[in-house]
Curated annotation (Swiss-Prot):
Pfam families hit by this protein: ATP-synt_A
Gene (name only): atpI
CDD domains noted in UniProt: ATP-synt_Fo_a_6
UniProt-listed InterPro entries: ATP_syn_F0_a_bact/chloroplast (IPR045082), ATP_synth_F0_asu (IPR000568), ATP_synth_F0_asu_AS (IPR023011), F0_ATP_A_sf (IPR035908)
Superkingdom to which the source organism belongs: Eukaryota
Record localization: Plastid, Chloroplast thylakoid membrane
Chief site of localization: plastid
Keywords on record: ATP synthesis, CF(0), Chloroplast, Hydrogen ion transport, Ion transport, Membrane, Plastid, Thylakoid, Transmembrane, Transmembrane helix, Transport
Cited NCBIfam families: ATP_synt_6_or_A
Membrane disposition: Multi-pass membrane protein
Protein name, as recorded: ATP synthase subunit a, chloroplastic
Length: 247
């Protein structure tokens, strides 16, 4: 019978799938530092896409908005509503920060599924979505932490630190720990979801024909958008919380 050859082929296929490598990096040596080139290249591409789209859409504003201008006005209104809901009436100065976070993460996530990164060959590793790398997500989370510390200190001065002993000094260790868990949860949630989504697509493409993974890719686009929304919402909520001084 053909049972043994079929079993051997199945095991060989599983072995090939297990050979999918994660973690190879391409570095630039600048001075005495190693720069993670993959993340920089893909981040520059995402930034170029965002800037180019905005410039093309609003370079000649019309009283009656064109399709592109209308789209970006809708996006701006969405970000303003999100910021106002989470931060409150003093949301205005934070709209650019929240908008930048949301748009960069959104386009980065979608670029992993829509842009043919693998066409560009590197000496080591391969290009992928910027948010597929823990360095990017940690940097975004640390920026968010710096933003809500700045918001609290600029709004309340040194009395901002009184929140650590409210409502009782017993909660001091927990309140301090919370400042570490916030960026950790932000960074690992985003990194884990985007990495898992791309790995699932890679494995499915290795297992089955191209048509079958397409529904999973569409689901990945949806979840990628949701992750950008979650990150921006939490960032705005943390900023609003630090300005109001309650948990």
């Amino acid at each position: 019978m053909n049972i043994i050859p079929c079993s051997i082929k199945t095991l060989k296929g599983l072995y090939d799938i297990s050979g999918v490598e994660v973690g190879q990096h391409f570095y630039w040596q600048i001075g005495g530092f190693q720069i993670h080139a993959q993340v920089l290249i893909t981040s520059w591409v995402v930034i170029t896409i965002l800037l180019g789209s905005v410039i093309i859409a609003v370079r000649n504003p019309q009283t009656i908005p064109t399709d592109g201008q209308n789209f970006f006005e809708y996006v701006l209104e969405f970000i303003r509503d999100l910021s106002k809901t989470q931060i409150g009436e003093e949301y205005g100065p934070w709209v650019p920060f929240i908008g930048t976070m949301f748009l960069f993460i959104f386009v980065s996530n979608w670029s992993g599924a829509l842009l043919p990164w693998k066409i560009i060959q590197l000496p080591h590793g391969e290009l992928a979505a910027p948010t597929n790398d823990i360095n990017t997500t940690v940097a975004l989370a640390l920026l968010t932490s710096a933003a809500y510390f700045y918001a609290g200190l600029s709004n309340k001065g040194l009395s901002y630190f009184e929140k650590y002993i409210k409502p009782t000094p017993i909660l001091l260790p927990i309140n301090i720990l919370e400042d570490f868990t916030k960026p950790l949860s932000l960074s690992f949630r985003l990194f884990g979801n985007i990495l898992a989504d791309e790995l699932v697509v890679v494995v499915l493409v290795s297992l089955v024909p191209l048509v079958v993974p397409i529904p999973v890719m569409f689901l990945g686009l949806f979840t990628s958008g949701i992750q950008a929304l979650i990150f921006a919402t939490l960032a705005a909520a943390y900023i609003g919380e630090s300005m109001e001084g309650h948990h």
